[in-house]
Amino acid sequence: MSNWPSSRAQQVLAALLRIGWTIKRQSGSHRTLSRPGWPDFVFAFHDGEEIGPSMLARIAKRTGLTPNDL
C-alpha cells in the first residue's frame, strides 16, 4: 500500500510551489518547473485531473515532495 493519497493536479502543483518550485514556462497544460539544485521538471496535468498514488510517488522521487506537503 502506498503512503500517497490520490490528489487533484491543482493541489499537487500548489504543494510543489510551496516547497520552492517555480513555474519557468508553460505551454498549454505542460508547465516546466524549476528549483535550485534540482533538474527541471515538466508537470503535464490539467488542474482538475486526479493523480493516483503511484504517479504521485514518481513525481515525489523527482521533486522532493512528501505526503506531508500535500
Residue ranges and their predicted role:
Residues 1-70:
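Basic nucleic-acid-binding interfaces
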